[in-house]
């Protein structure tokens, strides 16, 4: 009986990570370590190459100049029959949304105005029946409370308001410290660590709900 239960707890489904920078890498590292469940496939989407500012990558053994999206393949030593990394070394645009195939889609793109493309990704994922989570302000020194709740539940968060203007008003989870550029605080490794934990846990729960 116990053996049968253990045998049934195998990886299932797919989680897509849209954006694989400092936060995405942390989430990816968590996901590849999950056992007795978790994703069968992890899709990684990012068109950028690693440079000298990507310290968390070089600390983990990455080479400057290699694609960020390829790096999780190097770290994941699982047999592909157990867990497969699908690396897509390009940024998601309105023209390649069909590359996104995850049951759960976690969006952590940064730099500039990312709201319009994030909204398109969310809408595309929802059309496919996928569940979604993204960030909306993750600044802070590291002792902030990380909130994870539906977009419909937030107040006084300009990033959330902008996403709502793009038509995302419900059935989308947001992870945030509620600290933004306006608050003049840094983004520390401690904050990224905690946000990554919350996004990982939430993504795994969403995936489990899809298959149980």
Q: Which role fits each region the language model picked out?
A:
Residues 1-212:
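Adenine nucleotide-associated cytosolic modules
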